[in-house]
Amino acid sequence: MPDEAFMPHPVVPKRAGATPHTSIIPPFPCATLRAIPYCLEFAMRRELAIEFSRVTESAALAGYKWLGRGDKNTADGAAVNAMRIMLNQVNIDGTIVIGEGEIDEAPMLYIGEKVGTGRGDAVDIAVDPIEGTRMTAMGQANALAVLAVGDKGCFLNAPDMYMEKLIVGPGAKGTIDLNLPLADNLRNVAAALGKPLSELTVTILAKPRHDAVIAEMQQLGVRVFAIPDGDVAASILTCMPDSEVDVLYGIGGAPEGVVSAAVIRALDGDMNGRLLARHDVKGDNEENRRIGEQELARCKAMGIEAGKVLRLGDMARSDNVIFSATGITKGDLLEGISRKGNIATTETLLIRGKSRTIRRIQSIHYLDRKDPEMQVLIL
């Protein structure tokens, strides 16, 4: 390229009547100019990823204030408030698609709520301000603040009901099918990973509904990790290179299932899900039947078939997602918050699906330097 290509040249500002100013940007060929909008979009999305990490950090700090105080609802409310405050500072046109409930059930972060400044990309957002409210209230491990963001229409708009989940990492992608018996799935996963069943590790929620399944897996020789709560964190571990967890199986919340689907899609793992009515999970009494019928009606209204196997692409339709999780209490995935006076440290897992970049961010927060509305929630 000739030397004059690097000489300053005039750039005309957009403002009418302004005089040209000087730029040291070289004159790009036409092909490069056509690529600039994509590059700008890419840079903007990277900046958004950091903004979303600030959202989960703030929610985690707000929840931590109520750590071990036995009040899971107050802890969750504080995290919801903090998450909403921070989301509304981000330059997005965001819609909550997985949140704290319907508009008549939740004052904030309800399904359909608009968040962000209204400027910027139109995105759908799945939130779980505290994944593990009971664990936070009791001071137990593995509580997180979680958020996933995707393109408009990316996520399944799942009702707040139960979901059967089967999740594996990239090494076993394409080998799972909830239409098959669990034992067949475990054998297929073990074969794909090149290990015997005795070396396969499955994580499952330690709930009475899983007692028979746990016994079945152990009889097969599978190693079972039964955890009290927190299947989003456990699902991520199936895809982490340094984790010994191979499979997550069990029945948990459908909203958490969609959040898991987002991060599993971002990490190139695989997942099947199946929506289940309450009376099919908790027992067929009058109250459970009443709630279950309402859930099934909601599914029908949303065009979703309960009981049908959902593939990963049904729940997260693109890998162009950003996922952020900040630890509240120490767990298998993340360190918890530590605080001394007005100084707190956090660890955040930040994942960009398009580039499949995984970052662990350790931050130090001077809490008395936060915005006044945040100080009320975290100090």
Whereabouts are the PLM-identified features?
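Intrinsic disorder/low-complexity segments
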Residues: 1-40
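N-terminal subdomain of lithium-sensitive/metallo-dependent phosphomonoesterases centered on the IMPase/IPPase/PAP
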Residues: 39-126, 187, 191, 218, ...
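Oxyanion/phosphate-interacting regions
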Residues: 40-41, 48, 237-379
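General beta-strand structural signal in soluble alpha/beta enzymes
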Residues: 96-100, 125-127, 136-138, 157-158, ...
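Acidic beta-strand-loop-alpha-helix segment within the catalytic core
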Residues: 146, 151-226, 319, 331-333, ...
